[in-house]
Regions:
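Glycine-rich phosphate-binding loops that contact phosphosugars or nucleotide phosphates
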Residues: 1-85
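Short, amphipathic alpha-helical interaction segments embedded in low-complexity terminal/linker regions
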Residues: 81-156
């Protein structure tokens, strides 16, 4: 069930065509984000996202508007995938690893907001479940211990 998402403003980039052809030869679905829905790359794709943007304000700046549009579309796609795959609770990203101090603080804030608990309770929940944010949120919301919360999440 793999899918390739290609990006090409013009739809004329040869190495993008090559990657698309390779993915297609492996049986993958191929989608494309491009400004030119009639390009060769668009003809190779199973799905084409081609926003109609109009001309850039100042010509010659390497399709700045198209690049920004592609970035916005990618953010929408990844946000949708995060929600669909269970990485989001309410509007909070709960599948967050604490790889540094900033992310550890973000985990605490998420558990506090999702669970309506104090900082001390959030830290204690995170410490008891090896800093698995989603597990800590479930613990605070339900009163389950770390093991039971982890098992319940694994089942769903």
């Amino acid at each position: 069930h793999d899918m390739m998402l290609a990006l090409s403003v013009s739809g004329k980039t040869p190495w993008v065509w090559g990657a698309m052809r390779h993915a297609w030869s492996l049986g993958s679905t191929v989608a494309l984000i491009t400004e030119d829905a009639q390009s060769e790359a668009a003809q190779l794709a199973s799905m084409v996202i081609a926003p109609e943007l109009g001309a850039d304000v100042v010509a010659g700046y390497t399709n700045a508007k198209a690049g920004i549009a592609q970035s916005m579309i990618l953010h929408m796609i990844t946000t949708g995938l995060a929600v669909r795959s269970g990485r989001v609770y309410s509007n909070l990203r709960v599948d967050l690893e604490a790889s540094n101090t900033r992310w550890a603080e973000r985990q605490i804030a998420i558990v506090m907001e999702a669970g309506g608990c104090s900082r001390a309770q959030a830290k204690a929940a995170l410490e008891s479940c090896n800093h698995q944010c989603k597990t800590a949120v479930l613990m605070v919301l339900t009163g389950l211990d770390a093991w039971k919360a982890h098992e319940l999440l694994a089942q769903n």
